[in-house]
Amino acid sequence: MALNKNFIYKELNNEYMLIPVEGDSVSLTKVFNLNEVGSFIYKSLKEKDDIEYVVNKLTKEYQVSYDVAKKDVIDFINELKKRGIYE
């Protein structure tokens, strides 16, 4: 599985979003807004497409337990899959 390269990640005024690219244009009606943790997970997945790597980074960055971090990462990945962002 991997992140779909047809999405552009943008940060603007402390807002995080994934914007789908369709051909030569972007589709603003299908923008996926992220919170700070979602943004962190997405960027970590771009670094290394490995759940354990992302979970360990999340536990260190946000001082959460391994179990909480793993659930958050898996839930986030499942949402990305539903939206076609992670295939």
Regions found by a protein language model. Give the residues of each.
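Long, charge-rich, low-complexity alpha-helical segments
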Residues: 31-87
